[in-house]
Amino acid sequence: MRRDMNLDETNDVTATTQDVLAHHLECFGKVDLAGTMADYTDASRFFTPDGLLRGSEAIRRFFAVLFEEFEKPGMSFELLRQEISGDTAYIVWTAETADNRFEVGTDTFIVQNGKILTQTFAGKISPKH
């Protein structure tokens, strides 16, 4: 059973979640694989439309492939919405790469101890070719 947190603890958790999300988005924008992976641990889980990724090595492989696409010239990314409450962050975004149009993407992050413990991703992706 989860204990009730006082307001200061809730604010601290929210601030940590905000910091982790800001770092994650900054590293994603720079296509920085090492920086992105600093947000995950071997206990992290990442739910994608293609299945569950468990641990930092599986998540690293996912981002390595994604970053190959996102580092090509002409990439654009727009963050449409960001909500943070306690240990949970939610974002909605659009992006375009040389290969695909991400008409909408959404991620949810659960942050514990300064790391992303759980992440979900879903999106509507249309190939350009």
Predicted ranges, named:
Residues 2-12, 26-29, 47, 60-129:
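A beta-strand edge to alpha-helix "cap/lid" segment located at domain peripheries
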Residues 14-15, 53:
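Short, solvent-exposed loop/helix junctions and linker helices
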Residues 31, 50-51:
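Conserved short acidic donor-positioning loop in nucleotide-sugar-dependent glycosyltransferases
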